[in-house]
Amino acid sequence: MELGYVLTEGKTKIVYAHPTDPDLAILYHKDGITAGDGARRSVIEGKGELAGQTTANVFRLLNRAGIATHFVDAPEPRLTVVRRCRMIPLEVVMRRLPAGSYLRRHPEAAGQRFDPPLVEFFLKDDARHDPQIAPQEIIAQGIATPAEVEQMTDTGRKVFVTLEAAWQQLDVTLVDLKIEFGRTAQGDLLVADVIDNDSWRIWPSGDPAQMLDKQVYRNAQVVDEALLADVRARYALVAELTGRWGAGS
């Protein structure tokens, strides 16, 4: 597929203008994987294709569920065609179980289950390690309106339970999930960016020892070829499993 000019480039993707439609953009999924706000970086050959496949599978499911997203098409495994958005500089995190940074902040929460899923906001700022930000501060800083904060909270929970149900059909527990939102030129709020195997914690049979997500890379003491091959195999399995969500639909 022909690509337009580069709009922006991040750690794991490049965003291109669409060559013919100014309302669209094209995401190119790179082979990079990072952890610690980019402090650890590696390249896994083929990861971009797997990330693109997973993202397409996820967003097709969300679109079928009636959730407003930026996803339009995935003409190639590495490419995602999306509605062009101005991104809101927030990570919206939904949690069913306490893990990761939440458990470090709230060790007393070990063993709890959040119903409905807990929603937290984090300001996208690598230099400050993406600090948590309260809804009232989001509003005070003019990042989003009160209505948008409410919409992101409600939509975040809908996204989570939709993906949670899909994973449950495969005996996989969705522990937590990170998403982002963008605004179209018309002001519509959409689930945007990517949702791939870097975006969640997933535990087959509810067992963290079997985790399939990026946490394997984060947790590793040593990054070597064996680790990267293992991570790639897990990403390939996730791309294949999420592909089953569209079977027969």
From Swiss-Prot:
It comes from the Bacteria. Pathway: Purine metabolism; IMP biosynthesis via de novo pathway; 5-amino-1-(5-phospho-D-ribosyl)imidazole-4-carboxamide from 5-amino-1-(5-phospho-D-ribosyl)imidazole-4-carboxylate: step 1/2. One of its GO terms (molecular function) is phosphoribosylaminoimidazolesuccinocarboxamide synthase activity. GO terms for biological process: 'de novo' IMP biosynthetic process. PROSITE patterns: SAICAR_SYNTHETASE_2. Keywords: ATP-binding, Ligase, Nucleotide-binding, Purine biosynthesis. The keyword ATP-binding applies. It catalyses: 5-amino-1-(5-phospho-D-ribosyl)imidazole-4-carboxylate + L-aspartate + ATP = (2S)-2-[5-amino-1-(5-phospho-beta-D-ribosyl)imidazole-4-carboxamido]succinate + ADP + phosphate + 2 H(+). CDD domains: SAICAR_synt_Ade5. SUPFAM superfamilies: SAICAR synthase-like. InterPro entries: SAICAR_synt/ADE2_N, SAICAR_synthetase, SAICAR_synthetase_CS. Its EC number is 6.3.2.6. It is an enzyme of class 6 (ligase). It holds the Pfam family SAICAR_synt. Belongs to the SAICAR synthetase family. This is Phosphoribosylaminoimidazole-succinocarboxamide synthase.
